[in-house]
Design a protein with these regions (language model features):
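A mid-to-C-terminal "edge-of-domain" accessory segment
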Residues: 77, 88-89, 94, 160-161, ...
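Iron-sulfur cluster-binding cysteine motifs and their immediate structural context
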Residues: 352-357, 388-412, 439-466
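Flexible glycine/proline-rich, aromatic-decorated loop/lid segments
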Residues: 155, 159, 223-225, 275, ...
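FAD-binding subdomain of flavoenzyme oxidoreductases
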Residues: 1-132, 143, 350-360, 364-375
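Short beta-alpha connecting loops at secondary-structure transitions
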Residues: 120-124, 236, 286-291, 322-331, ...
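Non-ligating segments of multi-cofactor redox enzymes
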Residues: 313-314, 321-330, 334-375, 409, ...
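Iron-sulfur-cluster electron-transfer modules
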Residues: 228-232, 419-505
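C-terminal substrate-recognition/cap domain of FAD-linked oxidoreductases
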Residues: 82-90, 94-297, 305, 310-313, ...
Length: 505
């Protein structure tokens, strides 16, 4: 969440895990019998983990490097912090899985500790004319009882229609406590820090639940709003970097200037400033070589800024993926990267789990194999394929999910436009009839969890309408029903009442 930082992230609260490895072996690290069985069946893995642990601990320079890198949020590459944090090989294996993105095994179950939920909290939106001063304020607040501090740059504020002022930077802060008295003391301590800064408006802390909800709705609304206003046919890319807190003012201003210099005038920067962790959003087209070059140049400069200048994290929360795979060794250095590769080979010697993710020998993999987003249907063109809709899709797991329907329809549209593979086009169109069309409930539940509020059912209705031939029997029945709704409704009611009457004893 907004306040987990590094002290309460998934690695810190993880207790045990049920893992399925590449060879099909199942290990439950929280079960003594499972651990003993794994020792007997895979002694080479246990010994390998212990050997890596001992070599890491014997290298003071590497230990220092690892601790420094994980002092801030960092998920670039594999999580090698367990080698200095834990001694038991099963604990190390458990925590190696965190952030591994399916490259080491499948986590089917896990046990985590819960955090304390404070009953009282107070929030305030702090506005600054200058981004640097906003960041300097965050640095100063770091030593106060602040729970979280979220930065929203001018584009972020504009996207959610904040009318406080023009070209402002905001910091949304929150503090929490077990008692009202402690909460008041926390607010007073934070207000004392704020006295040293030039705020655009007087800060107003509120503990009213409705007001608090409005503040945090603004923060939550940035990504879907910005993504929803991107030009059609472009991909929304949200990157995720982190700096050490003392570098925050300089690094934030450098990042903002870099995005502007590379032509990303509509980009926005927001995120967990208290942890030095920012997300920046860009709308990127990959249609031309110039588009690809623009993106390549930006990523090259980002790596120089984050790694060379500030020794930060190229990935703080979202995972390495393919986009940052070529830069893992650059960030970590050869020794740490060698440890990661050794772990990968130990747990997945045949490289069958998510190949190309985190570890990729192609230095240009981040500018290859782009997924096109052709204009397909006005109801779905804003889709960014995040998959949030799938939890409410009735056919997900049976045939296709709402996201998969959109992906397939985009591929059909692309094949129609390019004409490159007519056989594949016909196959997709034929298979979609059942998997995509007939099994779609078209009830719109998918839109309730979609950040863009996209109703894939509207797409299905369009496709079904298009499939009905004019003057066909189906078309005539549809026309008749549309022209005689009251009579049909009455007839259905009468039929239902008759059935009820017949079924009564």
């Amino acid at each position: 969440g907004m306040s987990c930082g590094t002290h309460a992230n998934s690695d810190k609260v993880l207790k045990s895990m049920r893992i399925v490895f590449a060879d099909g072996t199942v290990l439950d690290t929280g079960d003594a019998d499972s651990r003993n069985a794994f020792k007997q069946s895979h002694p080479e893995i246990i010994k390998g983990i212990e050997d890596i642990r001992d070599r890491v601990l014997a290298d003071d320079e590497l230990v220092k490097r690892i601790k420094h890198k994980y002092a801030i949020k960092n998920v670039t590459g594999l999580n090698i912090y367990p080698f200095v944090e834990h001694t038991d090989p099963f604990d190390i294996i458990t925590h190696l899985m965190v952030g591994s993105e399916g490259t080491l095994g499948f986590a089917s179950e896990f046990t985590m500790t819960t955090g304390h939920l404070y009953p009282y909290s107070s929030s305030a939106m702090l506005y600054f004319k200058d981004m640097r001063e906003a960041c300097e304020c965050v640095v100063a607040l770091k030593n106060s009882p602040v729970e979280c501090a979220e930065l929203l740059d001018k584009k972020s504020l504009a996207s959610v229609n904040d009318t406080t002022g023009d070209n402002l930077t905001a910091i949304l802060v929150r503090t929490s406590a077990d008692t009202k008295e402690q909460l008041a003391a926390n607010v007073a301590a934070m207000e004392k820090v704020l006295e040293g800064f030039n705020l655009y408006v007087q800060p107003k802390f509120t503990s009213d639940p409705e007001e608090n909800a409005k503040y945090w709705a603004i923060r939550s609304g940035v990504f879907p709003v910005v993504a929803g206003t991107r030009p059609l046919g472009t991909t929304v890319i949200i990157e995720d970097i982190a700096f050490h807190i003392e570098d925050l003012p300089d690094a934030t201003c450098d990042l903002a200037q870099m995005l502007q210099d590379h032509g990303y005038d509509d980009s926005c920067i927001y995120g967990h400033a208290l942890e030095g962790n920012y997300h920046f959003i860009i709308a990127q087209s990959f249609k031309t070589e110039a588009d690809v070059k623009q993106y390549r140049d930006l990523m090259s400069e980002i790596t120089k800024l984050v790694v060379d200048k500030y020794d930060g994290s190229l990935k703080a929360e979202h995972g390495t993926g393919r986009n940052m795979a070529p830069f893992v060794e650059k960030e970590w250095g050869p020794k740490a990267f060698a440890v990661m590769k050794e772990v990968k080979h130990l747990l997945d010697p045949q490289n069958i789990l998510n190949p190309g993710v985190i570890f990729n020998d192609d230095p240009d993999c981040f500018v290859k194999s782009f997924k096109p987003l052709p204009l397909t249907n006005e109801h779905i063109d804003k889709c960014m394929e995040c998959g949030f809709c799938e939890v409410n899709c009735l056919s997900c797991g049976f045939t296709m999910s709402s996201r998969q329907r959109i992906v397939v329809q985009r591929e059909i549209a692309r094949l129609k436009a390019t004409g490159e593979d007519d056989a594949r086009l016909k196959r997709l169109q034929k298979q979609y009839v059942y998997y995509g069309n007939m099994t779609c409930a078209a009830d719109g539940l998918c839109s309730t969890s979609c950040p863009m509020k996209i109703n894939t059912g509207d797409l299905t209705h369009d496709l079904r309408n298009a499939a009905i031939k004019p003057n066909s029997f189906t078309h005539k029945v549809g026309d008749f029903c549309a022209d005689n709704v009251p009579a049909i409704r009455s007839g259905i009611k009468l039929a239902l009442l008759s059935l009820i009457h017949i079924s009564e004893p």
